């Protein structure tokens, strides 16, 4: 009985449960999953202004880029109980010392945070397809001597 909604300002398709207002999707959904590229438009999509719209006890998943979500705000939301949990395979300032990262510290303390490496697409099948594609590309374009 799960209902799936989505927000994309660039897609207009009546087949889907599209919500046209980003803050409305924050209010409506129990699980928010972000799958966007990083741009000026998507930088800190979750921020100090719109965190209040998020459904209490929501779970947030970010598999995009770390900068999509303002980590400072997420850390505060998890600590206060506003957000029930956060899962990500990316963090802001990914090249900084993770020992000083408050989000990493929440995970270490068992505060409903999961952080994994950004390699979900690196399955055996995906890697094999890349190998085949690249081999065919090099052979077809005479790039192998």
Predicted regions span which residues?
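Rossmann-like dinucleotide/phosphate-binding beta-alpha-beta segment
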Residues: 1-56
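Short beta-strands and strand-loop turn motifs
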Residues: 6-9, 33-35, 62, 88, ...
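Rossmann-like dinucleotide-binding domain for NAD(H)/NADP(H)
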Residues: 57, 64-145
């Amino acid at each position: 009985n799960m209902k799936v909604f989505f927000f994309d300002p660039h897609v207009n398709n009546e087949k889907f449960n599209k919500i046209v207002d980003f803050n409305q999707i924050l209010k409506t959904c129990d699980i928010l999953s972000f799958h966007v590229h990083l741009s000026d438009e998507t930088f800190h999509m979750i921020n100090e202004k719109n965190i209040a719209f998020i459904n209490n006890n929501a779970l947030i998943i970010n598999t995009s880029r770390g900068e999509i979500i303002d980590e400072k705000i997420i850390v505060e939301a998890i600590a206060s109980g506003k957000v029930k949990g956060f899962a990500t395979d990316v963090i802001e300032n990914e090249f900084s010392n993770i020992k000083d990262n408050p989000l990493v510290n929440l995970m270490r303390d068992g505060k409903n945070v999961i952080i994994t490496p950004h390699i979900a697409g690196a399955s055996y099948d995906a890697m094999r397809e890349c190998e085949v594609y690249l081999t065919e590309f090099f052979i077809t374009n005479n790039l192998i001597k």
